[in-house]
């Protein structure tokens, strides 16, 4: 446990700078809203998207006063919803506002479209997400190098970059007593991104410790620090909140301290439609972007060195396709001339969420959240032999079916991905599902299968980037194990709600409640899940960073294969899903890619 002395010391280290209302107004006045002020001009780097990764890279590049950076963001800085953004306890209230992109999928397995939540504004999805701060398993990141050929993308390297981003705040003794744990060696204390316990000042619910006691009796580890490289068991987690419990989004982290840099310009209210190229003997060279609001009102701006796409896993693939980079079949159908043949928009991997919720009695009231990172056996329980058999016998069939459905274009390469996932689950004790429990007068589990075998796609449907005609097709549950895993995790959440020490606080289930029999089997749970799931909004890999022969779109420095001066630097490039919330990975990834960009800049200077 962290001593009182160490807690006090770390709290003092992590004290944030407080920005006054006048400074906030000054930020607003510094942002560009008139596209004519940048149209036709040349910058060293143009970044398409002012979200987590785009702002991180912009801040690092513009540390060099000689480097001129332009960020183009569709949204704005803060908004009329600012108060909701700042309060992490208001999670969900921001959905459907002007800060939510609210992309729609094609009709899914239940014949309904689903909404993909994604932030719009300076900060991107850090404006609207749940602020959860965890790290993946070491073996997952190591596989990026060992399995996918991305030299330098291993746990040891990424761990240092992730810590470099972090400004950690240790838990107090009261927070430790409630269920937090802190290992100082797993955190960074000199970064920009605040992390620390969520605490609204109310008494702590005893339910977090009850869940830990219940799972501990089953031999499951409890009260862990989920930032050390092996997230397993049950513990409370950290959040991106400063010491005043204000959301520490990427806009606050990177724009507020740096907006006065004369070499950093940020254009808001404009969308990057496509990349501009010059043809060279070595292939297309990115020389700028076309941006605007519609086909009749758009502008060109130029990049001396590089164009960096940071529009997110749903949009960066579309920008590439509008620019002529992608599968010929997709581009031909949209009437776009192909410049480079790459599997853009394939291999998209998102997770699915269901909810199991119950009332609690008066003894269980209080604040708090706890997370159970459950392994394959813990999720499937008595069904483990059947689930294991699927992994040991169905990979070839799944790869063939996925390619036939348009989720990937190479059976052999996809099977390598599947074998990697199988090994994680059966040999490495990697967390397979996350059960996220919230209290505050209830026992509410939001839960998801972390390691999906389904592969979706996102593609353009026309040549006009400002019409927003596209097909986002996650293809949820078209893999049988994904559906069984989501059903089993949901069943487990119901069981835990009334098991062991949890039983004393249980006062009746509300979701699924009477909609599903108390003794429902896995098949019945599967039927329920199909009708009641939602996307988890953690999509990755639509511009996969891996060897080209495995289906890669970008290389180990995030450069788009077959082009010059073009990189993708956002959440579309991780080659795998991870057993974690994704912000820590994205921050570390952005810092690592920024170093690669700066290294190339130094060579050209």
From Swiss-Prot:
This is Glucose oxidase. One of its GO terms (biological process) is secondary metabolite biosynthetic process. Gene3D superfamilies: FAD/NAD(P)-binding domain, Glucose Oxidase, domain 2, Glucose Oxidase, domain 3. Belongs to the GMC oxidoreductase family. It comes from Talaromyces variabilis. One of its GO terms (cellular component) is cytoplasm. FAD binds at residues 52-53, 73, 125, 129-130, 132, 272, 571, 583. The active site is at residue 538. PROSITE patterns: GMC_OXRED_1, GMC_OXRED_2. InterPro entries: FAD/NAD-bd_sf (IPR036188), Glucose_Oxidase_domain_2 (IPR027424), GMC_OxRdtase (IPR012132), GMC_OxRdtase_N (IPR000172), GMC_OxRtase_C (IPR007867). Its cofactor is FAD.
